[in-house]
Amino acid sequence: MKKKKRILSFGLAVCCFVGLLGINTQKVKAAEYWPQDPETESPNAIVMEESTGTVLYDKNSTEQHCPASITKIMTTLLALENCSLDETVTFSKEAVYNTHGSGISRDVGEQMTMEECLYAVMLESANECAYAVAEHVGGTVENFVQMMNDKAAELGCVNTHFNNPHGLSEGEDATLHYTCCYDMALIAKAAYQNETFRAITATKTYQIPPTNKHDEITYLQNHNEMIHAFKTRGQYLYEYCVGGKTGYTTAANSTLVTFAEKDDMTLICVIMNAQSPAQWTDSIALYNYYFENFSLYNVAQNETRLENGEMDTGMLNTNSSFVKIDPAGNIVLPKSAEFSEAAPAVSYDNTSDDVLANIRYTFAGHDVGGADIVSTGVKADTFSFDNVKEEETSTETATTTKH
């Protein structure tokens, strides 16, 4: 009986915490203001805050288009998740002769490390390297493409189908290889959480040492004009840009994924189907606007309703050590708004031993982020339940069973 009471009380602590937030939701004042979206030339674009997934700007973001070489973000992500950087990649005849366009002139039988290949893929957009990486990771390109599509589904992509690892879209690929700005933002968000990916995409120049087929160093340059003056003499350099990937084919027009960081907030911008130089000018304009008008708030640091005891929380008032707000959770709000104006809603999580529930916040009709409610790891038997009346426990047990 004592064990059941302890388990029940742990659940009640969570329920009381949820109830606390639910009551205070009624006190959140109506907040209607959301900054008006700026104008852009590009027909398809999105700006997403990286830590929350909040969409700040949406212009036809789920419309299907050819991605061109921004495809290689997915290729790089899968390689990093499935391989070590020091693995040796050997270039097949297919990798060398079944690709064209951008590349670094590798030969059949040439060997490079996975790390060197990924720098070539992300900086020089080397198609033969993307093909070789796909063969190495998946065994065959076909298997790797299936991995790409499986990963897209896992990330919640809504309008994506990959048909190759490099983004060239000719013949069959012109209709079978497609994605959208929203999906590319999800893929970019997942990739950016990888430390090695962040290091690669932020690199301006890189040197591949001599190989078994090349006697000299191969010099690589990042084609992202927002972090490295590659062809435009620096007119599109953006001080807050920390990486990205370019793309272009005649079918796709110009595509661009970039990351920018300012004031502890990271934004992801995706541009598709653009006429150059709109991919650069629109990205910079969007970053400037959303950095100027939005701020990031840490939920654990700002959600004070638990500590303030704004309602009688019963067990929670004496037993709050069981649960806490995950310090990794954030929300993003217009700078004119206060944290308390965001309305919280709590849902339970039955899929994890550590995550008990999740708080999601909305503001002016927008989902702006949230945080997990997690167990602190405090054992139930460290808390004295002597102050819990037996009849109260019986009533609570019945209520809990009903739910």
What is each stretch, according to the model?
Residues 157-158, 175-403:
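Domain-terminus/edge residues, biased toward the C-terminal soluble/receptor-binding domains
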Residues 22-195:
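Active-site-adjacent loops and short helices of periplasmic peptidoglycan-processing enzymes
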Residues 17, 21-25, 52, 96, ...:
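Generic "edge-of-domain/loop-turn" microfeature
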Residues 14, 28, 50-51, 262, ...:
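Short, ordered coil/turn segments that flank beta-strands lining enzyme active or ligand-binding pockets
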Residues 11-14, 101, 239:
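A residue-level detector for conformationally permissive "hinge/kink" positions
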Residues 2-29, 403:
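Sec-dependent N-terminal signal peptides of Gram-positive bacterial secreted proteins and lipoproteins
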